[in-house]
């Protein structure tokens, strides 16, 4: 990230060191909006090499833009986290820090993937009373994945978990040891799509597609090159947790399938706007449909669902036409309050 950002450290409620990135913008006319990244990436995932990325468009629309590096960020020390830890410790502390620094009592949020699942747990448990609008991409409370991904979680994960504590798509650039080189060889032998080796490693790690997290037609060359440096370590502990959630069809506490986070009523008055890429092969769009149906039963007509026909998972944020197809919709929903 360049000098357009200030870095503000904060401690999660359990003492883990995280940070916020604050986009430097003269005299924002609207309140703070927090962007929350997914697993195995960092806040810079919202900052692709385009002047029309979501950060700049939010700032141009008058928002005070903040980005959270929670404990799953590759900018922070590797650690074996699960969604419960993030939900109960990281997001509440980040939102509290923003309200302290800005003086605003309300925050809006744009959240993605495991930043989204963990943030939604926080909201459901009433830990984010300051957050009034949540724009969630890809998955929220009800993870639904392709059948091959179910196979990988149930059959391959137990095997991989005996050898690795982390997987790391950056092995596509440099694999540090024999076992990581073996993984890279397997990926190169089974992924023939015209993506970078890191991009192929991403698809192997997170989904069931060639590629899984974006449509290649949605990316320009500059963005494809940039992606290679935006993925790194993700712990096996996360995959074990999400496997339990997928099995139950709803987010559940780590190691416990008897309770779940489909709280009724949810302990938040936030309006929730869901985005799902129809071509997503990491979390199927059905994930967001199920969460919307749950929200609609709880408060009919209050929440919103967008299914984006041309998009997958992360190209929602760094697709070459996202500034035309996606960001105006998100900003409009934030403006509605």
Positions of PLM-derived features:
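Alpha/beta-hydrolase-fold enzymes
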Residues: 100, 104, 117-249, 253
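Short beta-strand/loop motif that positions the catalytic acidic residue
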Residues: 268, 274-276, 280
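Catalytic active-site module of serine/aspartate enzymes centered on a nucleophile-bearing elbow/loop
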Residues: 292, 298-337
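Conserved alpha/beta-hydrolase "acid-adjacent" motif
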Residues: 281-287
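N-terminal cap/lid segment of alpha/beta-hydrolase-fold proteins
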Residues: 1-25
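Alpha/beta-hydrolase active-site loop
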Residues: 81-101
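Short, surface-exposed "cap/lid" segments of acyl-processing enzymes
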Residues: 19-75
């Amino acid at each position: 990230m360049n000098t357009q950002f200030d870095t503000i450290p904060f401690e999660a409620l359990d003492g883990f060191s995280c940070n916020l990135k604050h986009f430097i913008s003269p005299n924002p006319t609207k309140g703070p909006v927090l962007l929350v990244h997914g697993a195995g990436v960092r806040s810079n995932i919202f900052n692709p090499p385009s002047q029309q990325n979501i950060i700049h468009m939010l700032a141009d629309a008058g928002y005070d833009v903040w980005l959270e590096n929670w404990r799953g960020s590759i900018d922070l020390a590797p650690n074996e986290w699960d969604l419960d830890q993030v939900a109960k410790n990281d997001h509440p502390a980040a939102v509290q820090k923003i309200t302290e620094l800005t003086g605003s009592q309300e925050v809006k949020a744009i959240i993605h993937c495991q930043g989204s699942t963990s943030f939604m747990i926080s909201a459901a448990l009433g830990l984010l009373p300051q957050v009034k609008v949540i724009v969630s991409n890809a998955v929220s409370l009800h993870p639904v994945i392709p059948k091959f991904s179910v196979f990988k979680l149930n059959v391959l994960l137990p095997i991989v978990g005996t050898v690795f504590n982390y997987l790391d798509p950056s092995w596509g650039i440099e694999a540090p040891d024999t076992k990581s080189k073996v993984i890279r060889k397997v990926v190169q032998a089974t992924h023939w799509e015209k993506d970078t080796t890191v991009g192929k490693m991403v698809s192997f790690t997170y989904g069931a597609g060639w590629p899984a997290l974006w449509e290649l037609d949605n990316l320009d060359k500059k963005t494809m090159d940039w992606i290679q440096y935006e993925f790194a370590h993700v712990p096996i502990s996360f995959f074990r947790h999400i496997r339990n959630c997928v099995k139950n069809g709803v987010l559940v506490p780590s190691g416990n399938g008897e309770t779940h986070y489909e709280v009724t009523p949810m302990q938040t008055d936030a309006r929730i706007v869901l985005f799902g890429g129809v071509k997503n092969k990491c979390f199927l769009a059905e994930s967001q449909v199920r969460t919307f149906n749950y929200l609609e039963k709880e408060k009919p007509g209050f929440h919103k669902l967008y299914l984006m026909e041309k998009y997958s998972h992360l190209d929602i944020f760094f697709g070459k036409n996202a500034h035309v197809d996606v960001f105006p919709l998100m900003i409009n929903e934030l403006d509605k309050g």
